[in-house]
Amino acid sequence: MRSLRALLVLFAFVFIVVLTPALRSQAAAASPKTPSSPQLVIIDTDIGDDIDDAFALALALKSPELEVLGVTTTFGNTQMRARLVDRYLKAVGRSDIPVLAGPETKTGNLMTQAAYAKRDPERKFGDGAEFILREARQRPGQITLIGIGPLFTVEAAIKRDPATFKKLKRVVIMGGSVYRGYGLNTQGKPKPAEPEWNILNDPPGLKALLSSGVPVFMMPLDSTQVPLESQGREAIFAHGSALTDQLTLLYHEWTGGTPSHSPTPTLFDPVAVTYTFRPDLCPAKQMHINVDARGMTSPGQGSPNAEVCLQSDEKSFLDLLLKRVTAD
Protein backbone atom coordinates (compact mmCIF):
# COMPACT_ATOMS: atom_id res chain seq x y z
CA MET A 1 0.00 0.00 0.00
CA ARG A 2 2.86 2.32 0.88
CA SER A 3 4.54 1.63 -2.47
CA LEU A 4 1.29 2.46 -4.33
CA ARG A 5 0.96 5.72 -2.39
CA ALA A 6 4.57 6.58 -3.20
CA LEU A 7 3.96 5.92 -6.90
CA LEU A 8 0.90 8.21 -6.87
CA VAL A 9 2.89 10.99 -5.21
CA LEU A 10 5.67 10.55 -7.77
CA PHE A 11 3.16 10.67 -10.64
CA ALA A 12 1.59 13.87 -9.28
CA PHE A 13 5.03 15.47 -8.96
CA VAL A 14 5.94 14.57 -12.56
CA PHE A 15 2.62 15.94 -13.84
CA ILE A 16 3.04 19.25 -12.02
CA VAL A 17 6.71 19.79 -12.86
CA VAL A 18 6.90 18.39 -16.39
CA LEU A 19 3.51 18.19 -18.05
CA THR A 20 1.73 21.30 -16.75
CA PRO A 21 4.16 23.82 -18.36
CA ALA A 22 3.92 21.91 -21.64
CA LEU A 23 0.13 22.03 -21.58
CA ARG A 24 0.23 25.73 -20.80
CA SER A 25 2.53 26.41 -23.74
CA GLN A 26 0.25 24.40 -26.05
CA ALA A 27 -2.76 26.43 -24.89
CA ALA A 28 -0.88 29.67 -25.42
CA ALA A 29 0.08 28.59 -28.93
CA ALA A 30 -3.52 27.70 -29.75
CA SER A 31 -4.94 31.04 -28.58
CA PRO A 32 -4.59 34.20 -30.69
CA LYS A 33 -1.66 36.36 -29.68
CA THR A 34 -2.30 39.87 -28.48
CA PRO A 35 0.42 42.51 -28.27
CA SER A 36 1.72 43.28 -24.80
CA SER A 37 1.25 46.99 -25.43
CA PRO A 38 -0.90 48.85 -27.98
CA GLN A 39 0.50 50.28 -31.19
CA LEU A 40 0.99 54.03 -31.14
CA VAL A 41 -0.93 55.66 -34.01
CA ILE A 42 -1.71 59.12 -35.37
CA ILE A 43 -4.73 59.44 -37.65
CA ASP A 44 -4.74 62.02 -40.46
CA THR A 45 -8.27 62.46 -41.80
CA ASP A 46 -10.47 64.54 -44.09
CA ILE A 47 -13.49 63.76 -41.92
CA GLY A 48 -16.64 65.70 -42.72
CA ASP A 49 -17.15 64.96 -46.42
CA ASP A 50 -17.77 61.23 -46.81
CA ILE A 51 -18.92 59.27 -43.75
CA ASP A 52 -16.31 56.50 -43.68
CA ASP A 53 -13.80 58.64 -41.74
CA ALA A 54 -16.21 58.78 -38.79
CA PHE A 55 -16.47 54.99 -38.77
CA ALA A 56 -12.69 54.66 -39.09
CA LEU A 57 -12.15 56.89 -36.06
CA ALA A 58 -14.76 54.93 -34.09
CA LEU A 59 -13.01 51.66 -34.89
CA ALA A 60 -9.63 53.02 -33.84
CA LEU A 61 -11.01 54.29 -30.53
CA LYS A 62 -12.64 50.93 -29.78
CA SER A 63 -9.61 48.78 -30.65
CA PRO A 64 -7.41 47.96 -27.63
CA GLU A 65 -4.55 47.14 -29.99
CA LEU A 66 -4.23 50.85 -30.81
CA GLU A 67 -3.36 53.92 -28.76
CA VAL A 68 -4.41 57.05 -30.63
CA LEU A 69 -1.80 59.72 -29.87
CA GLY A 70 -3.60 62.40 -31.84
CA VAL A 71 -5.84 63.20 -34.80
CA THR A 72 -4.77 65.62 -37.53
CA THR A 73 -7.00 66.93 -40.29
CA THR A 74 -6.27 67.42 -43.97
CA PHE A 75 -7.79 68.91 -47.14
CA GLY A 76 -9.89 72.03 -47.52
CA ASN A 77 -11.12 73.72 -44.35
CA THR A 78 -8.95 71.78 -41.92
CA GLN A 79 -9.89 74.01 -38.97
CA MET A 80 -13.57 73.12 -39.46
CA ARG A 81 -12.67 69.44 -39.74
CA ALA A 82 -10.72 69.76 -36.49
CA ARG A 83 -13.81 71.22 -34.79
CA LEU A 84 -15.76 68.17 -35.93
CA VAL A 85 -13.16 65.78 -34.49
CA ASP A 86 -12.98 67.83 -31.29
CA ARG A 87 -16.74 67.60 -30.71
CA TYR A 88 -16.73 63.89 -31.58
CA LEU A 89 -13.94 63.08 -29.12
CA LYS A 90 -15.50 65.14 -26.33
CA ALA A 91 -18.83 63.37 -26.85
CA VAL A 92 -17.27 59.92 -26.48
CA GLY A 93 -15.18 60.84 -23.45
CA ARG A 94 -11.82 61.08 -25.23
CA SER A 95 -10.99 64.76 -24.90
CA ASP A 96 -7.50 63.60 -23.83
CA ILE A 97 -6.62 62.99 -27.50
CA PRO A 98 -5.06 66.07 -29.15
CA VAL A 99 -6.71 67.43 -32.29
CA LEU A 100 -4.68 69.44 -34.80
CA ALA A 101 -5.22 70.92 -38.25
CA GLY A 102 -3.11 70.45 -41.34
CA PRO A 103 -2.57 73.11 -44.00
CA GLU A 104 -5.76 74.49 -45.53
CA THR A 105 -6.20 73.93 -49.27
CA LYS A 106 -8.54 75.23 -51.94
CA THR A 107 -11.45 72.89 -52.55
CA GLY A 108 -14.90 73.06 -54.08
CA ASN A 109 -15.97 70.02 -52.10
CA LEU A 110 -19.04 70.33 -49.88
CA MET A 111 -18.38 69.46 -46.24
CA THR A 112 -21.57 67.50 -45.60
CA GLN A 113 -21.15 67.38 -41.81
CA ALA A 114 -20.30 71.04 -41.20
CA ALA A 115 -23.41 71.59 -39.04
CA TYR A 116 -22.11 69.03 -36.54
CA ALA A 117 -18.70 70.73 -36.50
CA LYS A 118 -20.15 74.21 -35.97
CA ARG A 119 -21.72 73.12 -32.69
CA ASP A 120 -18.20 72.90 -31.24
CA PRO A 121 -16.76 76.22 -30.00
CA GLU A 122 -14.56 77.89 -32.58
CA ARG A 123 -10.88 78.05 -31.71
CA LYS A 124 -7.52 77.86 -33.43
CA PHE A 125 -6.16 74.33 -33.65
CA GLY A 126 -2.44 73.66 -33.67
CA ASP A 127 -0.21 72.60 -36.57
CA GLY A 128 -0.91 69.02 -37.64
CA ALA A 129 2.31 68.53 -39.61
CA GLU A 130 4.39 69.78 -36.67
CA PHE A 131 2.54 67.42 -34.32
CA ILE A 132 3.42 64.43 -36.51
CA LEU A 133 7.08 65.47 -36.54
CA ARG A 134 7.22 66.15 -32.82
CA GLU A 135 5.75 62.77 -31.95
CA ALA A 136 8.09 60.99 -34.39
CA ARG A 137 11.04 62.80 -32.83
CA GLN A 138 10.02 61.81 -29.31
CA ARG A 139 9.16 58.18 -30.15
CA PRO A 140 11.45 57.16 -33.02
CA GLY A 141 10.49 53.93 -34.76
CA GLN A 142 7.32 53.50 -32.71
CA ILE A 143 4.53 55.43 -34.46
CA THR A 144 2.24 54.30 -37.26
CA LEU A 145 0.69 57.18 -39.20
CA ILE A 146 -2.72 56.26 -40.66
CA GLY A 147 -3.58 58.51 -43.60
CA ILE A 148 -7.24 58.37 -44.63
CA GLY A 149 -7.50 61.57 -46.67
CA PRO A 150 -5.58 63.48 -49.34
CA LEU A 151 -1.95 63.60 -48.26
CA PHE A 152 -1.46 67.36 -47.82
CA THR A 153 -0.62 67.17 -44.12
CA VAL A 154 1.69 64.21 -44.66
CA GLU A 155 3.38 66.00 -47.54
CA ALA A 156 3.84 69.13 -45.42
CA ALA A 157 5.55 67.10 -42.70
CA ILE A 158 7.88 65.43 -45.22
CA LYS A 159 8.87 68.74 -46.80
CA ARG A 160 9.42 70.44 -43.45
CA ASP A 161 11.71 67.80 -41.95
CA PRO A 162 12.31 64.67 -44.05
CA ALA A 163 14.86 63.25 -41.60
CA THR A 164 12.42 63.39 -38.70
CA PHE A 165 9.58 62.03 -40.83
CA LYS A 166 11.75 58.96 -41.46
CA LYS A 167 11.57 58.22 -37.74
CA LEU A 168 7.99 57.00 -38.18
CA LYS A 169 7.61 53.24 -37.96
CA ARG A 170 5.35 53.10 -41.04
CA VAL A 171 2.54 54.87 -42.87
CA VAL A 172 -0.72 53.06 -43.67
CA ILE A 173 -2.95 54.85 -46.17
CA MET A 174 -6.31 54.43 -47.81
CA GLY A 175 -5.59 55.51 -51.35
CA GLY A 176 -4.97 54.52 -54.92
CA SER A 177 -6.54 52.32 -57.56
CA VAL A 178 -4.27 49.61 -58.91
CA TYR A 179 -6.47 47.33 -61.02
CA ARG A 180 -9.98 48.27 -59.91
CA GLY A 181 -11.88 51.59 -60.02
CA TYR A 182 -15.03 52.76 -58.27
CA GLY A 183 -18.02 50.44 -58.35
CA LEU A 184 -19.21 48.03 -61.02
CA ASN A 185 -19.98 48.41 -64.70
CA THR A 186 -23.31 47.61 -66.33
CA GLN A 187 -22.30 43.95 -66.56
CA GLY A 188 -21.72 43.80 -62.81
CA LYS A 189 -17.94 43.61 -63.12
CA PRO A 190 -15.41 45.90 -61.41
CA LYS A 191 -14.57 49.03 -63.37
CA PRO A 192 -10.96 49.48 -64.49
CA ALA A 193 -8.46 51.49 -62.46
CA GLU A 194 -9.01 55.24 -62.25
CA PRO A 195 -7.73 58.13 -60.12
CA GLU A 196 -8.86 57.56 -56.53
CA TRP A 197 -10.09 60.60 -54.56
CA ASN A 198 -7.31 60.90 -51.98
CA ILE A 199 -4.52 60.61 -54.55
CA LEU A 200 -6.37 62.57 -57.26
CA ASN A 201 -6.34 65.62 -54.98
CA ASP A 202 -2.62 65.43 -54.19
CA PRO A 203 -0.51 63.23 -56.50
CA PRO A 204 2.72 64.95 -55.33
CA GLY A 205 1.86 63.94 -51.77
CA LEU A 206 1.92 60.24 -52.61
CA LYS A 207 5.10 60.66 -54.65
CA ALA A 208 6.76 62.32 -51.68
CA LEU A 209 5.55 59.60 -49.33
CA LEU A 210 6.72 56.73 -51.54
CA SER A 211 10.21 58.25 -51.72
CA SER A 212 10.37 59.26 -48.03
CA GLY A 213 12.15 56.14 -46.83
CA VAL A 214 9.30 55.19 -44.49
CA PRO A 215 7.57 51.82 -45.11
CA VAL A 216 4.26 52.49 -46.88
CA PHE A 217 1.22 50.20 -46.81
CA MET A 218 -1.54 51.01 -49.32
CA MET A 219 -5.19 50.02 -49.13
CA PRO A 220 -6.51 50.99 -52.60
CA LEU A 221 -9.99 50.79 -54.12
CA ASP A 222 -9.19 47.18 -55.00
CA SER A 223 -9.63 46.13 -51.34
CA THR A 224 -11.64 48.84 -49.60
CA GLN A 225 -15.04 49.02 -51.33
CA VAL A 226 -16.91 47.34 -48.49
CA PRO A 227 -20.56 48.43 -48.13
CA LEU A 228 -22.25 48.85 -44.75
CA GLU A 229 -25.70 47.52 -45.59
CA SER A 230 -28.91 48.42 -43.77
CA GLN A 231 -28.77 45.54 -41.27
CA GLY A 232 -25.34 46.61 -40.03
CA ARG A 233 -26.32 50.28 -39.96
CA GLU A 234 -29.44 49.57 -37.95
CA ALA A 235 -27.44 47.56 -35.40
CA ILE A 236 -25.11 50.51 -34.90
CA PHE A 237 -27.78 53.22 -34.83
CA ALA A 238 -29.95 51.27 -32.36
CA HIS A 239 -27.09 50.60 -29.95
CA GLY A 240 -27.47 53.88 -28.08
CA SER A 241 -23.92 54.47 -26.82
CA ALA A 242 -22.20 57.84 -26.91
CA LEU A 243 -20.07 56.62 -29.81
CA THR A 244 -22.86 55.16 -31.91
CA ASP A 245 -24.97 58.27 -31.25
CA GLN A 246 -22.24 60.38 -32.89
CA LEU A 247 -22.14 58.00 -35.86
CA THR A 248 -25.92 58.25 -36.15
CA LEU A 249 -25.84 62.05 -36.18
CA LEU A 250 -23.03 62.22 -38.70
CA TYR A 251 -24.57 59.57 -40.94
CA HIS A 252 -27.85 61.49 -41.19
CA GLU A 253 -26.02 64.74 -41.91
CA TRP A 254 -24.08 62.91 -44.63
CA THR A 255 -27.20 61.46 -46.27
CA GLY A 256 -28.94 64.84 -46.02
CA GLY A 257 -25.96 66.60 -47.54
CA THR A 258 -25.67 64.16 -50.45
CA PRO A 259 -29.28 63.24 -51.31
CA SER A 260 -28.33 61.97 -54.76
CA HIS A 261 -25.93 59.40 -53.30
CA SER A 262 -26.75 55.90 -52.10
CA PRO A 263 -27.60 55.75 -48.37
CA THR A 264 -25.18 52.83 -48.08
CA PRO A 265 -21.75 53.94 -46.86
CA THR A 266 -18.64 52.40 -48.36
CA LEU A 267 -16.14 51.71 -45.59
CA PHE A 268 -12.93 52.62 -47.43
CA ASP A 269 -11.11 54.15 -44.47
CA PRO A 270 -11.93 51.59 -41.76
CA VAL A 271 -10.12 48.96 -43.85
CA ALA A 272 -6.90 50.95 -43.46
CA VAL A 273 -7.41 51.21 -39.69
CA THR A 274 -8.12 47.48 -39.47
CA TYR A 275 -4.95 46.64 -41.37
CA THR A 276 -2.80 48.17 -38.63
CA PHE A 277 -3.79 45.45 -36.14
CA ARG A 278 -5.33 42.69 -38.31
CA PRO A 279 -3.19 42.53 -41.46
CA ASP A 280 -4.45 39.01 -42.05
CA LEU A 281 -7.79 40.51 -43.13
CA CYS A 282 -6.12 42.41 -45.97
CA PRO A 283 -2.86 40.65 -46.93
CA ALA A 284 -0.44 43.03 -48.61
CA LYS A 285 2.23 42.26 -51.17
CA GLN A 286 5.26 44.24 -52.24
CA MET A 287 4.78 46.29 -55.39
CA HIS A 288 6.33 49.20 -57.22
CA ILE A 289 3.66 51.88 -57.57
CA ASN A 290 3.95 54.66 -60.15
CA VAL A 291 1.99 57.89 -59.62
CA ASP A 292 1.18 60.21 -62.53
CA ALA A 293 -0.03 63.81 -62.57
CA ARG A 294 -3.68 62.72 -62.78
CA GLY A 295 -3.40 60.62 -59.63
CA MET A 296 -3.31 57.24 -61.36
CA THR A 297 -1.47 54.62 -59.29
CA SER A 298 -0.26 51.87 -61.57
CA PRO A 299 2.00 48.88 -60.96
CA GLY A 300 5.42 49.27 -62.53
CA GLN A 301 8.92 47.91 -62.79
CA GLY A 302 11.56 48.62 -60.20
CA SER A 303 12.19 48.03 -56.55
CA PRO A 304 9.09 47.75 -54.36
CA ASN A 305 8.11 51.08 -52.80
CA ALA A 306 4.92 49.96 -51.05
CA GLU A 307 3.06 46.97 -49.72
CA VAL A 308 -0.39 46.88 -51.28
CA CYS A 309 -3.53 44.96 -50.31
CA LEU A 310 -5.54 44.02 -53.39
CA GLN A 311 -8.28 41.97 -51.73
CA SER A 312 -9.76 42.03 -48.23
CA ASP A 313 -11.81 39.54 -46.24
CA GLU A 314 -14.98 41.62 -46.30
CA LYS A 315 -17.12 39.42 -44.05
CA SER A 316 -14.52 39.12 -41.29
CA PHE A 317 -13.81 42.83 -41.53
CA LEU A 318 -17.48 43.77 -41.17
CA ASP A 319 -17.96 41.33 -38.29
CA LEU A 320 -15.01 42.88 -36.49
CA LEU A 321 -16.16 46.46 -37.10
CA LEU A 322 -19.71 45.83 -35.90
CA LYS A 323 -18.52 43.95 -32.82
CA ARG A 324 -16.03 46.65 -31.87
CA VAL A 325 -18.21 49.69 -32.52
CA THR A 326 -21.17 48.27 -30.58
CA ALA A 327 -19.09 46.97 -27.65
CA ASP A 328 -19.76 48.63 -24.28
Explain the meaning of each model-derived region.
Residues P35-P38, F55-K62, E67, W197-L200, ...:
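Conformational coupling and interaction surfaces
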Residues T78-L84, S177-G181, V291-N305:
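Short, mixed-charge aromatic SLiMs
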Residues T34-T45, I51-R83, D120-M218, T224:
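Active-site histidine-anchored catalytic micro-motif
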Residues L8-A22:
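Bacterial N-terminal signal peptides
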